[in-house]
Amino acid sequence: NTVSSFQVDCFLWHVRKRFADLELGDAPFLDRLCRDQKSLRGRSSTLGLDIETATRAGKQIVERILEEESDETLKMTIASAPAFRYPTDMTLEEMSRDWFMLMPKQKVAGSLCIRMDQAIMDKNIILKANFSVIFDRLETLILLRAFTEEGAIVGEISPLPSLPGHTNEDVKNAIGDLIGGLEWNDNTVRVSETLQRFAWRSSNEGGRPPLPPKQKRKMARTIESEV
């Protein structure tokens, strides 16, 4: 049920935090850890449950499961689980770097937040992203950023910690929003080959994904009106 699910999530987050404290986690692991922490705080407030108490209860649930779990069953479970991969266009420095906007524009699309600097004009821009992949398809966006040729960050798409969960289509639509807003100011935008491959399952030499017609004008107007 909802309470026991929250308790198990709290304990598993605690285990992952201990792992991170040993400096064993990579960038996607640490990013998910931070986002999940914010999500757990929100769920704690909604359910009226103390996180520390829930963590102890979650530990007891997990221990009971492990006591009943045979090694053979565990091997079969692991073998049948789909394998995730984590393509990384951006370095840790590019992901963690602070950036500022002269003319900030922001739009919330479902569980994704789209931000861009509309003071940027006549630039060549590339979209890079770090994300998880399952069955050769983008599963979860960790972070997407728009970079100029000089390396400046001028746009971003990030999941909202308070609204976890998004689909491949959500990500593609958000990318369309961002491209439309940037191209409104005569910037030339291309998408990294890695992102094209796993989001659209295609690769275009010009770096342009197959966005629906009129999306550029529509999305640019939407971003302008909603902020």
From Swiss-Prot:
A motif (Nuclear export signal) lies at residues 134-143. InterPro entries: NS1, NS1A, NS1A_effect_dom-like_sf, uS15_NS1_RNA-bd_sf. Gene3D superfamilies: Influenza virus non-structural protein, effector domain, S15/NS1, RNA-binding. It is found in: Host nucleus; Host cytoplasm. The keyword Nucleotide-binding does not apply. The keyword Membrane does not apply. GO terms for cellular component: host cell cytoplasm; host cell nucleus. Residues 177-212 are annotated as: CPSF4-binding. Residues 202-227 are annotated as: Disordered. Keywords: Eukaryotic host gene expression shutoff by virus, Host cytoplasm, Host gene expression shutoff by virus, Host mRNA suppression by virus, Host nucleus, Host-virus interaction, Inhibition of host innate immune response by virus, Inhibition of host interferon signaling pathway by virus, Inhibition of host PKR by virus, Inhibition of host pre-mRNA processing by virus, Inhibition of host RIG-I by virus, Inhibition of host RLR pathway by virus, Interferon antiviral system evasion, RNA-binding, Ubl conjugation, Viral immunoevasion. GO terms for molecular function: protein serine/threonine kinase inhibitor activity; RNA binding. Upon interferon induction, ISGylated via host HERC5; this results in the impairment of NS1 interaction with RNA targets due to its inability to form homodimers and to interact with host EIF2AK2/PKR. A motif (Nuclear localization signal) lies at residues 31-35. Its main location: host cell. Pfam families: Flu_NS1. Residues 220-227 are annotated as: PABPN1-binding. GO terms for biological process: symbiont-mediated suppression of host cytoplasmic pattern recognition receptor signaling pathway via inhibition of RIG-I activity; symbiont-mediated suppression of host gene expression; symbiont-mediated suppression of host mRNA processing; symbiont-mediated suppression of host PKR/eIFalpha signaling; symbiont-mediated suppression of host type I interferon-mediated signaling pathway. Inhibits post-transcriptional processing of cellular pre-mRNA, by binding and inhibiting two cellular proteins that are required for the 3'-end processing of cellular pre-mRNAs: the 30 kDa cleavage and polyadenylation specificity factor/CPSF4 and the poly(A)-binding protein 2/PABPN1. In turn, unprocessed 3' end pre-mRNAs accumulate in the host nucleus and are no longer exported to the cytoplasm. Cellular protein synthesis is thereby shut off very early after virus infection. HAMAP family: INFV_NS1. Belongs to the influenza A viruses NS1 family. The dsRNA-binding region is required for suppression of RNA silencing. Homodimer. Interacts with host TRIM25 (via coiled coil); this interaction specifically inhibits TRIM25 multimerization and TRIM25-mediated RIGI CARD ubiquitination. Interacts with human EIF2AK2/PKR, CPSF4, IVNS1ABP and PABPN1. This is Non-structural protein 1. It comes from Influenza A virus (strain A/Chicken/Japan/1924 H7N7). The gene is NS.
